[in-house]
């Protein structure tokens, strides 16, 4: 089973008091606690490590590409937790370990080690981190113009845009007997009920939080399920073109690390995903208790599409 152990990272000091500090990442993992207690830290680290493991398995990167500095500044910086490694004395005291299905990783006080497991059964996942700031999506169309937005939110906006393009006749929501329809001509999502229609940007805060979460989760869960049910193997020529594209990306010295990551992810999307790891911050955000329950039931339904899917929520 995949698991993680964390000490001296941001608000997390001694870590989990049980099982020698290890936290199992089960099919459904729920992190509950007071505000500022480190719930999101755990979720963001799980997201980071699962992405690195996926990139290594897929061949996007080699182990040697992940130095301690790059892990801290680039990959943890993606989730804006790069400064969580340092205590009040500006000393790096963080201790983080991750045991995945294919790789083990350990960060300890400035040193980062990765080792490959000999015996493994790995299911290539579609990983989605759902930030708490997702309600901004309802009112922002050109996210790229907002340079201060978190990278995780920018990536979520990309998936949101992909998902809304897949809405055909409408998509029923799990609350209020409502549904959403996408007006492609005006690039507007409308929330409709039995006797009303309103643009998402003008809808209640509950709809503005729920629609991005539900739509992207629905879209990705079904996309992965289709790939599992109808796997497509690359032909010899397609495989050769893929290898050539990867080599070309690595040879391009003008690319930044982030640009290279995006390019490799785009090329590697040809691989069939066989699992969906949905990491959700605050699924209950701005929702009435009955609506919270219905949203949770939907997330659990998507998670049950495959035995290999995982749901992590804070």
What residue spans do the PLM features occupy?
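P-loop NTPase switch/coupling surface
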Residues: 1-185, 192-193, 266-270, 304-309
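Switch/communication elements of ASCE P-loop NTPase nucleotide-binding domains
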Residues: 1-54, 195-314
């Amino acid at each position: 089973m995949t698991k993680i152990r964390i000490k001296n990272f941001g608000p997390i000091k001694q870590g989990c008091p049980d099982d020698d500090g290890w936290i199992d990442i089960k099919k459904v993992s729920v992190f509950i606690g007071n505000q500022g207690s480190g719930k999101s830290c755990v979720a963001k680290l799980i997201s980071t490590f699962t992405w690195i493991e996926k990139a290594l398995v897929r061949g996007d990167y080699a182990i040697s590409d992940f130095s301690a500095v790059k892990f801290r500044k680039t990959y943890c910086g993606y989730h804006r937790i790069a400064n969580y490694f340092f205590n009040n004395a500006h000393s790096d005291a963080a201790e983080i370990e991750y045991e995945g299905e294919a790789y083990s990783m350990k960060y300890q006080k400035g040193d980062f080690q990765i080792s490959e497991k000999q015996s493994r059964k790995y299911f290539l996942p579609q990983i989605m981190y759902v930030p708490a700031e997702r309600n901004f999506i309802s009112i922002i169309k050109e996210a790229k113009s907002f340079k201060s937005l978190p990278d995780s939110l920018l990536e979520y906006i990309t998936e949101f845009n992909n998902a809304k393009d897949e809405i055909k006749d409408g998509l029923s929501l799990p609350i209020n007997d409502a549904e959403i329809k996408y007006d492609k001509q005006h690039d507007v999502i409308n929330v409709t009920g039995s006797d009303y229609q309103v643009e998402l940007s003008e809808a209640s805060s509950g709809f503005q939080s729920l629609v991005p979460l539900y739509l992207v989760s629905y879209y990705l869960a079904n996309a992965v399920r289709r790939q599992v049910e109808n796997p497509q193997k690359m032909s010899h020529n397609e495989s050769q073109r893929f290898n050539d594209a990867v080599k070309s990306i690595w040879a391009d010295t003008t690319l930044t690390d982030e640009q290279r990551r995006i390019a490799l992810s785009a090329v590697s999307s040809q691989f069939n995903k066989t699992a969906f790891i949905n990491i959700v911050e605050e699924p209950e955000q701005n929702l009435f208790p009955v609506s919270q329950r219905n949203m949770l039931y939907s997330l659990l339904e998507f998670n049950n599409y495959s035995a290999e899917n995982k749901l992590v929520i804070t």
